[in-house]
Amino acid sequence: MAKNKEIRINVTLECTNCANNSQKSSRGISRYITQKNRRNTPNRLELNKFCPYCVGHTVHKEIKK
């Protein structure tokens, strides 16, 4: 009997502002781990989260592991 893929999966969200910063003036890249429902959100997840390196709320996008 085959098992189905889990509906809820863990995803990693990464700050787009820190990741695309060409000057590398920030000390690091902000990352959050959260869960998403694969059926309800089949596309990549984007949330506004607080980035301690940018010192403000920025868009965090889902990245591949």
Swiss-Prot record:
InterPro entries: Ribosomal_bL33, Ribosomal_bL33_CS, Ribosomal_bL33_sf, Ribosomal_zn-bd. GO terms for biological process: translation. GO terms for cellular component: chloroplast; ribonucleoprotein complex; ribosome. It is found in: Plastid, Chloroplast. Keywords: Chloroplast, Plastid, Ribonucleoprotein, Ribosomal protein. GO terms for molecular function: structural constituent of ribosome. SUPFAM superfamilies: Zn-binding ribosomal proteins (SSF57829). The keyword Glycosyltransferase does not apply. Belongs to the bacterial ribosomal protein bL33 family. NCBIfam families: PRK00504.1, PRK00595.1, rpmG_bact. HAMAP family: Ribosomal_bL33. This is Large ribosomal subunit protein bL33c. It comes from Zygnema circumcarinatum (Green alga). The lineage of its organism: Eukaryota, Viridiplantae, Streptophyta, Zygnematophyceae, Zygnematophycidae.
